[in-house]
Curated annotation (Swiss-Prot):
Protein name: Protein HIR1
Entry's transmembrane regions: none
Entry's family note: Belongs to the WD repeat HIR1 family.
Comp. bias regions, Pro residues: 453-473
Span list, region Disordered: 419-476
Subcellular location: Nucleus
UniProt lineage: Eukaryota, Fungi, Dikarya, Ascomycota, Pezizomycotina
Residue ranges of WD repeats: 15-54, 68-108, 115-154, 157-196, 218-261, 267-325, 329-370
InterPro entries in the cross-refs: CAF1B_HIR1_beta-prop, HIR1-like, HIRA-like_C, HIRA_B_motif, WD40/YVTN_repeat-like_dom_sf, WD40_repeat_dom_sf, WD40_rpt
Entry superkingdom: Eukaryota
Length: 1044
């Protein structure tokens, strides 16, 4: 053995050489890379090192010096294919370089991988370079894609610093060593180049935890660099102990035994920090080729060990003692070792700044076996084979069909990202083609309206178009138009407005998922308000106060001690205090609806005739004894509502003609009495005047004996609610279509959609009627369950409950309510129960929350052909309930962030994920969230969303490998396609699920699952049933195999 240590082979400093922490050899054996405390990654020529004694050698010694870290570099590793070089440092960043510019040694950083919260201690590449794994002092094991360098998974199973990583040469496992005195072995399947974090949720699973050899191991080592033998059968674990003695534990593959009977390498006086197996197998004797052309001699492996005792030992599997032991090889601890690919050159680094090279004579370690012998040995562990075996031609054909459909989807998304395709489809809103308005409308109010009218939730309200909108011009024409846009400055000079690069792109929203908890108000362009999106919800004109409509209740939850009596009339005094400062939120009624007093004061300056608040509404006696009490609107002087739900436009003057501009919108106006009583008695006030106008001309008018609190209407009818609880309805021509309907308390919310009319009273009762059929789908229902009445304590005191952000209707008469605590509810009229559709729990626990996947965010009508023109508050059958689930989830995000609870719940979830027993928490919550979405879409009858969410759910089940759920889901989609003999023939299932044929949904699910070979025993029978795999295809496949 020759020891080579050139003087120039260092990381020089001003006073002394820097400590060298890591080294590695390139797969071609030509380069040595070292990393040290100077923040440099230096690449050396191995040929120059071996010829350092030759003064005639003139070739470059140092090939490159790369400095892209701000601190000490602890680990540096070449990828197995030699294409990349990864380095990890105490700046918690891994830089990846590439040598794709031969023949000059030009190493450039192509990606900075940020994922650790503390120092990165070690790195490792898989045998096929498909993944890079980093470990650090933050106790994390982070898996990165070796192709895209996206983070695939973070493993938080360790409880202390992780200081070593090694990969199985058979490419099935990797092992990590930690200061929690364990080695954890993880099983993985090599991910494809286009793998994403969501695809790999069921990959990289913990296989085994080894603790026995490390129970008394010291925690003073800087590294715990273990190594996997080239035959894949053993792991050499550093910093183990055998009784009181430091040792290297040899762990057996498969059993992972850490028992006292295991093999231990004993001889070092201090803890061993690094072990390194030679990458080659060796014969002890000169190999002899037998008559069959093979070599039948046994092979041995060679392992080098070093650590804090500054000694280096080399062992093989035959000798009980090291066949080489060096004393005082370095002045300080040896930190890393690396073998050359030929297995006969060893490089070592130490904290004294030394970089050592040991060259062994031929036969000194043994006689190297060929690389084919390595592959032959590893083949028994499945090296070179993909997990899962095709079980017949049907499974192969199903897999090909699945991948073909997936490829088409990828090509379509890439085409969208690159701006391919023809003319853009005209926007389809609420089932009818329309022209995109210049301003975004929310609940009938323009985004340019004063801030005094808060909108409870986003809802598009595009203006109806008299004719179908023309197709948009090609992308290049739109770009030219943007380039030529001229603006006028304050000084009157004309200039061409600068154009953002992003504004000229014809590319739509990216279809790549980006899941994060963000407020919809902070997203660019207010994507939730985009008129291209379909939202099947009514557009109430009267807004809600900030924080939602105030509600108070007396809970159902009983206390341990009952409080009897209310002699001091505390209930009445608390109710009166609710309108004073310090009580419940006080809101004023203006012409624009319910607004805060401060906003009303600022708005009064620019309104000619503001709507005055005359007085509070008369309180119904039922309100004082009700468990639920909602804030009652005050009596306003003027209340208006347009037929299309848009913001009422005030009369203006045309700047060009000087003539008055009169809006042509049909508008209902209610004017309550403002003067004094004509008889002298307060109760003898003038009647309320109801008038309907269009283009400034009266269409009809009527009078009501009581003051009006709320009005609503559309193209089918108008309605007004009075302070005595009565509701009146008129046809568009002014006919009273039914007698006055009397409620049990004052109305606080009234809304309409199509022929449906909804009214919520002050005692929390929700009424809904169909004015076309003069019927109700269900009896009046109470809002008490969704106001958390079951969680509040029963007693004489009123309790503040969550406010109502909005209560609206869809075109099918389904009631949708959003709360200020972030929860969203829908009333199921078939089951007579409230169902929670959205809640903050999903926002921090699910990986699918707030996804920007275009298939979820921009749900558009499936009808590309021009549909007949429909009324503004109607949608086509395909778009019933469209957009309701995303709207409720956006409200959840906004309210959750507004209250500040997101930060603390996210901390709780982060702590749970790393806790024992919660390893599958994030995965389970994500699957449950998708199941919740699928069930919600089915309940609402949201056709497009149901198919999208079902597809996402099936993909996740396939990635998780949940065979039980998959089989149950496929069977539920089958319906009557398969009938068991013991099933009753009279019970038949519907062929349609949420507007889709069962066979179509089943076929899509089978094609999605077809690429998972471990699920093909479940999916192949369904593929045969659906005709995805036909007899002709099987014969063609068999003929092809025969020809081969």
């Amino acid at each position: 053995m020759h020891l080579i240590k050139p003087q120039w082979l260092t990381h020089p400093g001003d006073l002394k050489d820097f400590e060298v922490y890591s080294c590695h050899v390139s797969p071609d054996g030509s380069r040595l890379v070292t990393a040290a405390g100077d923040g440099y990654v230096r690449i050396w020529s191995i040929d120059a090192i071996l010829n350092s004694h030759d003064p005639e050698y003139k070739k470059p010694k140092q090939l490159a010096a790369v400095s892209h870290h701000s601190g000490t570099i602890h680990a540096v590793r070449f990828s197995s294919n030699g294409k990349y070089l990864a380095s990890g440092a105490d700046d918690k960043i891994k830089g990846t370089g590439t040598n794709e510019a031969p023949p000059v040694e030009n190493w450039r950083v192509i990606r900075r991988l940020i994922g650790h919260d503390n120092d990165v201690q070690d790195l490792g590449w898989s045998a096929d370079s498909s993944i890079l794994v980093s470990v650090g002092l933050d106790s994390k094991v982070v898996v990165w894609s070796g192709h895209s360098f996206e983070k695939l998974k973070t493993l938080s199973n360790h409880q202390s610093h992780v200081k070593g990583i090694t990969f199985d040469p058979a490419n099935k496992y990797f092992a990590t060593a930690s200061d929690d005195r364990t080695i954890k072995v993880y099983r993985f399947n090599s991910p494809p180049p286009n793998a994403t974090q969501q695809d790999q949720v069921n990959n990289f699973v913990l296989e085994h935890t080894i603790t026995t050899p490390f129970l008394t191991s010291p925690l003073t080592t800087y590294f715990r660099r273990c190594s996997w033998s080239p035959d894949g059968a053993h792991i050499a674990a550093a910093n183990a102990t055998n009784g009181p003695v430091s040792s290297v534990a040899i762990l057996d593959r498969g059993t992972w035994d850490g028992q006292p009977s295991q093999t231990s390498l004993i001889g070092h006086e201090g803890p061993v920090e690094v072990t390194a197996f030679s990458p080659r197998l060796f014969y002890q004797q000169q190999p002899r080729v037998e008559h069959d052309g093979n070599i039948h001699q046994p092979t041995v492996t060679v392992v080098a060990c070093a650590g804090q005792d500054k000694c280096l030992s080399i062992w093989n599997t035959v000798l009980a003692r090291p066949f080489m032991m060096t004393q005082e090889l370095a002045a300080k601890s040896i930190t890393d070792m690396a073998w050359a690919p030929d297995g006969e050159k060893l490089f070592a680094t130490s904290l004294d700044g030394g970089i050592l090279t040991m060259v062994f004579e031929p036969g000194e370690l043994g006689f190297p076996a060929s690389l084919a012998e390595n592959e032959k040995t590893l083949s028994k562990f499945g090296a070179g084979r993909r997990v899962g075996i095709i079980e017949g031609t049907d499974a192969l054909l199903l897999e090909e069909s699945s991948k073909s459909g997936e490829l088409k989807g990828v090509q379509g998304r890439m085409g969208a990202l690159m701006g391919d395709g023809g003319a853009v489809q005209p926007p389809i809103t609420n089932g009818a083609n329309g022209i995109v308005p210049s301003t975004t409308l929310t609940n009938g109010s323009s985004s340019t309206a004063p801030a005094a009218a808060p909108a409870p939730a986003p809802a598009p309200a595009p203006a109806p178009a008299p004719a179908p909108a023309p197709a948009e011009p090609p992308v290049d024409q739109r770009v030219e138009k943007l380039k030529q846009r001229v603006t006028v400055t304050k000084e009157g000079k004309k200039r061409i407005a600068p154009m953002l690069v992003s504004s000229s792109s014809g590319v739509g929203t990216s279809s790549l998922p980006q899941t994060q908890l963000i407020s919809a108000k902070t997203t660019s362009g207010a994507r939730s308000d985009n008129p291209h999106n379909i939202l099947d919800l009514s557009k109430p004109y009267d807004g809600f106060p900030k924080g939602g409509l105030a509600s108070m209740l007396i809970g159902n939850k009983r206390k341990f001690a009952e409080i009897e009596g209310d002699e001091d009339r505390q209930v009445e005094r608390r109710l009166a205090a609710s309108v004073r400062p310090g009580g419940a939120a006080v809101v004023l009624n203006s012409e624009s609806g319910l607004i805060p007093p401060a906003a009303a004061a600022s708005k009064s300056n620019d309104v000619a005739e503001p709507s005055k608040v005359l007085r509070p509404a008369i309180i119904s006696p039922s309100l004082s004894v009700s468990q639920v009490r909602l804030a009652v609107p005050k009596v306003r002087s003027v209340i208006t509502r347009t037929a299309d739900g848009s913001e009422p436009q005030r009369n203006g003057v045309d700047a060009n003609t000087g003539k008055a501009e009169i809006p042509d919108t049909v508008m209902l106006e209610a004017r309550n009495a403002t003067g004094h009583s004509r008889t002298g008695r307060a109760q003898d006030h003038d009647p309320a005047k109801i008038s309907c106008t269009s283009k400034g001309q009266p269409l009809w008018q009527d009078f009501l004996p009581k003051s009006v609190l709320l009005v609503t209407g559309n193209t089918n009818f108008f309605a007004a609610a009075c302070e005595d609880g009565s509701i009146y309805a008129w046809s568009p021509a002014g006919r009273r279509t039914l007698n006055a309907m009397v409620l049990d308390a004052q109305p606080v919310i009234m809304d309409c959609r199509g022929w449906w009319l909804m009214c919520i009273s002050a005692v929390g009762m929700c009424h809904i009627w169909n004015l076309k059929t003069m019927s109700a789908p269900h009896p009046p229902i109470s809002l008490a369950p969704i106001l958390d009445i079951a969680a509040h304590t029963q007693g004489p005191h009123l309790t503040r409950s969550p406010g109502i952000v909005f209560a609206r209707l869809n075109s099918a008469g389904c009631i949708v309510v959003a709360m200020s605590n972030g929860e969203g509810y829908v009333y199921n009229s078939s089951m007579y129960i409230w169902q929670r559709i959205s809640e903050p729990w999903w926002s921090v626990g699910s990986q699918y929350w707030n996804t920007t996947d275009s298939s979820v965010s921009n749900i558009r009508s499936s009808q590309d052909k021009a549909a007949p023109k429909e009324k503004d508050d109607q949608v086509s059958i395909e778009n019933i309930s469209a957009g309701i689930i995303p709207a409720l989830e956006r409200n959840t995000t906004n309210q959750f962030l507004l209250q500040g609870r997101a930060f603390y719940l996210q901390r709780l979830i982060k702590a749970l994920i790393s806790a024992e027993g919660y390893e599958t928490f994030e995965s389970s919550v994500s699957v449950a969230h998708l199941e919740n979405r699928v069930a919600a879409a089915k309940t609402l009858g949201a056709r497009e969303e149901f198919k999208i969410y079902l597809s996402m759910y099936v993909k996740r089940l396939g990635a998780e490998g949940l065979k039980g759920k998959i089989e149950e889901l496929l069977r539920s989609l089958t319906g009557d396609l398969i009938v068991e003999e013991d099933e009753e023939s009279g019970e038949q299932q519907e062929e349609i699920i949420c507007g889709w044929k069962r066979e179509e949904l089943l076929k899509e699910a089978v094609l999605i699952l077809g690429k998972h070979r471990d699920l093909q025993r479940i999916t192949v029978p369904y593929a045969r049933l659906l005709g995805i795999v036909t007899e002709d295809q099987r014969q063609d496949e068999q003929a092809m195999i025969t020809d081969m």
